[in-house]
């Protein structure tokens, strides 16, 4: 809101922000848990085999970057509940306490339309839809849509698939679900 939004308004440029509502007002997405934990850890090595992840040396900045590159794809496609548990345990093992929120607040989301920014839904918990039962996806998407409509006091009819790779991150049944929920 302090850098891009004023420029978008000044030059009349359209923009859309897709919001995963479960992380507003203090949340942290799974990838931010991994990156932040590795960045802040006082350790030089992580023992992770019992989490079905490789043990990793993280004693230098380069090793930490490589660890992130190794871990993100391994954790990304875990079902949401497993992914969350792995991230929380991972942060504990890294001996970090990640309190700082990286996401917008509800008030910031509500302010976006004043800058000409469209707000779209992006699920509530940002699951990889293809890894979850369709009914879970429906509930998560509806929660996001309803939350945003409540905050903005207007219809939310745009949606972005988490990660967005057809066939890998979502399937045709998810496309049909999105349409049935009134998204364009």
Which residues make up each language-model segment?
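Catalytic alpha-helical scaffold of carbohydrate-active enzymes acting on polysaccharides/glycoconjugates
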Residues: 1-158, 165-184
């Amino acid at each position: 809101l302090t850098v891009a939004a004023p420029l978008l308004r000044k030059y009349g440029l359209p923009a859309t922000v897709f919001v995963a509502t479960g992380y507003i007002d203090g949340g942290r997405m799974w990838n931010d848990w991994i990156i932040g934990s590795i960045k802040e850890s006082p350790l030089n090595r992580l023992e992770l085999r019992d989490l079905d992840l490789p043990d990793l040396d993280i004693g230098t900045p380069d090793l930490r970057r490589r660890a992130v590159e190794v871990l993100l794809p391994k954790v990304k496609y875990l079902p949401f509940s497993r992914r969350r548990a792995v991230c929380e345990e991972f942060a504990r093992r890294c001996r970090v306490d990640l309190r700082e929120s990286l996401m917008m607040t509800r008030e910031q989301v509500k302010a976006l339309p004043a800058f000409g920014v469209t707000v779209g839904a992006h699920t509530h918990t940002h699951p990889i839809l293809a890894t979850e039962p369709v009914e879970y996806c429906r509930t998560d998407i509806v929660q996001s849509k309803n939350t945003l409509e409540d905050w903005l006091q207007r219809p939310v009819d745009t949606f972005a698939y988490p990660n967005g790779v057809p066939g890998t991150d979502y399937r045709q049944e998810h496309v049909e679900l999105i349409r049935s929920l009134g998204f364009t």
